A protein has these predicted regions:
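ATP-binding N-terminal substructure of ATP-dependent carboxylate-amine bond-forming enzymes
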Residues: 1-95
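Conserved small/polar residues in nucleotide/adenosyl-binding loops
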Residues: 66, 103-105
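Short alpha-helix plus adjacent loop in nuclease-associated cores
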Residues: 95-102
Length: 105
């Protein structure tokens, strides 16, 4: 399975490590990633708010699954757009992410 992981933080680093260790993973791409994540997958320098760039990368690498960590691409509709072009994505829709971003604890 070819997986694209969006993000560069500690949570995404932990997810990348788990994906890398899965026997189901044939290739892991990470964007934008960080220096420590380069050991786990191939990092591509696409900002998390570049929705078109992320969709184009997912098509180019023929991703079977995109895992979206940060809130910004979720609120901007990355999952919605990926689903519209036939690419499976893990994360809430833009509407659900927007609702979650409005909740203050």
């Amino acid at each position: 399975m070819i997986i694209l992981l969006v993000g560069s933080g500690g949570r995404e680093h932990a997810i990348a490590r788990a994906i890398k260790n899965s026997p189901l993973t044939s290739k892991l791409f990470i964007t934008p990633g960080n220096p420590g994540m380069q050991k786990l997958g191939e990092c591509k320098n696409i900002p998390v708010d570049d929705i078109e760039g992320l969709c184009n990368l997912a098509k180019l690498i023929e991703a079977n699954l995109v895992i979206i960590g940060p809130e910004v691409p979720l609120v901007k509709g990355l999952k919605n757009k990926l689903n519209n072009i036939g690419i499976k994505a893990f994360g809430p829709t833009a509407e659900a992410a927007m609702l979650l971003s409005l909740i203050h604890i």
